[in-house]
From Swiss-Prot:
The keyword Cell division applies. It comes from Bacillus velezensis (strain DSM 23117 / BGSC 10A6 / LMG 26770 / FZB42) (Bacillus amyloliquefaciens subsp. plantarum). It holds the Pfam family MinC_C. Interacts with MinD and FtsZ. This is Probable septum site-determining protein MinC. GO terms for biological process: cell morphogenesis; division septum assembly; regulation of cell septum assembly. It comes from the Bacteria. Keywords: Cell cycle, Cell division, Septation.
Length: 226
């Protein structure tokens, strides 16, 4: 299938279907008109009676939900075509803010007392203790420069690579993603800082903090951030 060009649409056939590169400088109405003209002229079929997947590339154009639906409906009006994906190189401010928050390291200096809950979207660096009955939650990793004697939940948004580290690891409950470990019996008071993580089988493991550099070599964002 050869590449064909219209004023606002470039179509390329691939082994995965059709890829539509849409002009990102024209108005949305002009884009719809150009796409409508292209669809009315060209006929697309795989010769087997199956629908052809369409992958849309928007470039530096952002589509609102209503616009995306109009685009999808227009392509779906051709009975042999179905939209598989819509990709854009730009995102909404809200999405950008959410991504920023998830990648942030939030530093807090306090004692989390019984009944209190400390919640952050990204990584948490707590300078202080978590008393029994206190809870800390983070979408990313948890680092406690103090005693962890309450509840710690890291990776609550589905991050199974999150870790929990503490100067004194004596929790009543540890949770990473959805994996729960209640007051691990083998944790004993000592001088070594410890960390908890999920192994390749999804089991929670407690190790000396020195092992963290080998277990999660990508954890370098704290450098220069403390």
């Amino acid at each position: 299938m050869k590449t064909k060009k219209q004023q606002y649409v470039t179509i390329k056939g691939t082994k995965n279907g059709l890829t539509l590169h849409l002009d990102d400088a024209c108005s949305f109405d002009e884009l719809l008109d150009g796409l409508q003209n292209m669809l009315s002229i060209e006929q697309y079929t795989d010769g087997k009676g199956q629908k052809i997947s369409v992958h849309i590339k928007l470039g530096h154009r952002y589509l609102y939900q209503e616009q995306a639906e109009k685009l999808t409906d227009l392509i779906a009006s051709k009975k042999d075509l179905v939209v598989h994906s819509i990709d854009s190189e730009v995102i909404a401010k809200e999405e950008a803010q959410r991504m920023k928050e998830e990648q942030e390291i939030v530093s807090v200096s306090k004692i989390v007392r019984s009944g209190q809950v400390l919640h952050v979207t990204g990584d948490l660096l707590l300078i202080g203790d978590v008393n029994p009955g206190g809870t800390i939650r983070a979408g990313g990793n948890i680092f406690v420069l103090g005693s962890l004697k309450g509840i710690a939940h890291a990776g609550y948004n589905g991050n199974n690579r999150a870790v929990i580290a503490a100067s004194e690891m004596m929790p009543t409950q540890l949770r990473i993603n959805h994996v729960l470990n209640r007051s691990p019996d083998h944790i004993q008071k000592g001088n070594d800082m410890e960390c908890a993580y999920l192994d390749t089988d999804g089991n929670m493991v407690i190790e000396r903090l020195q092992q963290l550099a080998h277990l999660r070599p990508d954890l370098t964002r704290l450098e220069g951030g403390m």
